[in-house]
Regions:
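Rossmann-like NAD(P) dinucleotide-binding subdomain of oxidoreductase/dehydrogenase enzymes
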Residues: 62-179
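N-terminal Rossmann-like NAD(P)+-binding subdomain of aldehyde/semialdehyde dehydrogenases
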Residues: 1-74
Length: 179
C-alpha cells in the first residue's frame, strides 16, 4: 500500500472503531474487570493515540521528502516497512498497549501477526471486521491462544523481522533466542 492509502485505511479504521466504543468498553469491563470509567478512558486514549500516530506518520513522510545536510553530505532518507512484525499485547491494558504496538507497525506498511493477550481477546472481536474492511487480506493476521505455544514456533521460523512485545524481559529474551 502507498503512504496515502495506509493513512486513509487507518483513518477509516479508527472512524469505524469509534462506532464500536460501547461494545468494546463493555468487553473491557467483563473480561478484564475494569470499571466503566477506566474502560472508557482506555478506549478514548487508544483512539487519541491512533490519531496522534497518523499525524506523526504524516510528518515523517513530509520530512522524508526533504534532503538533509550533515557533515557536508546531502542525504535523502525514506523510511519504509521492515517486513513481518509479531505483536504480543499485555493483559492489563489489552486495547491501548496492544494498539501502541500494532498501529505504528501497520501504518509503516508492515505485515502484522497479532496475538492478543489471553485476558482481553474478546474486545478485539468487534474490531476484526473493521480491520478486514480497511486493510488488504494478509496484512493483519490475528492468532488466539497461549503466547508461548504460538510465538515460539513463529519466531523459530526465522520469518519475523520485528518482535513487538510489552511484557517481561525474560519473555523477550527467550523469544529472541528462538529466532
Amino acid at each position: 500500500m502507498k503512504v496515502v492509502d495506509r493513512i486513509r485505511a487507518m483513518e477509516n479504521f479508527v472512524e469505524e472503531m469509534k462506532q464500536k466504543r460501547d461494545t468494546v468498553v463493555k468487553l473491557l469491563m467483563w473480561e478484564i474487570g475494569k470499571n466503566h470509567t477506566d474502560s472508557q478512558k482506555e478506549f478514548d486514549r487508544t483512539v487519541d493515540y491512533i490519531y496522534d500516530t497518523i499525524e506523526a506518520y504524516k510528518k515523517i513522510d513530509r520530512d522524508s521528502a526533504k534532503f538533509q545536510k550533515h557533515s557536508g553530505i546531502n542525504a535523502h532518507i525514506r523510511r519504509g516497512p521492515l517486513g513481518v512484525v509479531l505483536c504480543l499485547g499485555p493483559y492489563n491494558y489489552p486495547l491501548n498497549e496492544t494498539f501502541c504496538l500494532l498501529i505504528p507497525a501497520l501504518i509503516m506498511g508492515n505485515t502484522v501477526i497479532f496475538k492478543p493477550a489471553k485476558h482481553g481477546v474478546l474486545l478485539i472481536s468487534p474490531l476484526i471486521e473493521a480491520f478486514k474492511k480497511h486493510f488488504p487480506p494478509g496484512v493483519i493476521n490475528i492468532l488466539f491462544g497461549r503466547g508461548r505455544v504460538l510465538a515460539t514456533p513463529i519466531m523459530e521460523s526465522g520469518k519475523v523481522n520485528v518482535l513487538a512485545l510489552i511484557g517481561h524481559s525474560s519473555s523477550a529474551n527467550s523469544l529472541q533466542e528462538s529466532h
